[in-house]
Amino acid sequence: MLDGASTAPSEAERCIIAMMLMQIALDTHDEVTDDGGDLRARQLVVLAGDLYSGLYYELLARSGETALIRSFAEAVRDINEQKVRLYEKKVERIESLFAAVGTIESALLVKLADRMAAPQWGQFAYSYLLMRRLLLEQEAFIRTGASVLFEQMAQIAFPRAKTLTKEQKRHLLRFCRRYIDGCREALFAAKLPVNGLLQLRVAELSGGFQAIAKKTVEEG
C-alpha cells in the first residue's frame, strides 16, 4: 500500500503508528469484562487502553492530521456500533453478521487506505482480515464446538434449536466456508503489488502454504 501511495514515507509511518496505537487501545478495552473479577485490575486495563488512545491522538494532533483523526474516529464509531450489535444479538441475518465482523476487523485499515489514496487496499484488508477471523472461528467450532460467531449463526439460522444436530452444524460450516471462499477469491482477484511476506501470509491463510513450501524446496 505504501509503495503506491503519494504520501511521504515519514508521514505514512506516522499514520500507521497512530492506527496501531488506536487498534491496541481497542483491543485493550476489549479485555475488560463484567464477570465480577478484581475491580482494580479492570480499572487498570481501562486506563491502559485510554493511554494508548491518548498517544494516538497526541501523535496525530501534533502533526496537524485532523482529517485522519476524524476518519479514525468514524472507524472507531463503526467498530463499536457493530460490537454492540453483536453483543446485544441484534443481527438478524448471517450475511449481516459477517459484514459486522468484517467492519470490526478492518475499519481502521480501510480508513488508512483511504488516507493513502489507495482504497483498493482497504478492500483487500477487509477480505483478508474477515477471512482470517472466519478461519479462526471455524477452527474453534470444529475443534471444541465453541465459537461466539457460530453461536450467533446458530441463533439466526436455527432459533428454536436448543442443541444443534450434526446436519445443522454441517450447514453452518458450509455457509462459513462459502464466505471464506468468497474472501479468498477477492484476494486473488485484487492483483495488487503485494510483497513477498504478504504473499506468504495470504497463501498460508488460503491453504496454499504447503504448496509454496514444496515448490520452494524443489526450486532451492
From Swiss-Prot:
Its EC number is 2.5.1.30. The keyword Transferase applies. Signal peptide: none annotated. GO terms for molecular function: heptaprenyl diphosphate synthase activity; transferase activity, transferring alkyl or aryl (other than methyl) groups. It is an enzyme of class 2 (transferase). It catalyses: 4 isopentenyl diphosphate + (2E,6E)-farnesyl diphosphate = all-trans-heptaprenyl diphosphate + 4 diphosphate. The keyword Transferase applies. GO terms for biological process: isoprenoid biosynthetic process; menaquinone biosynthetic process. InterPro entries: HEPPP_synth_su1. Keywords: Isoprene biosynthesis, Transferase. Supplies heptaprenyl diphosphate, the precursor for the side chain of the isoprenoid quinone menaquinone-7 (MQ-7). Heterodimer of component I and II. This is Heptaprenyl diphosphate synthase component 1. The lineage of its organism: Bacteria, Bacillati, Bacillota, Bacilli, Bacillales. The gene is hepS.
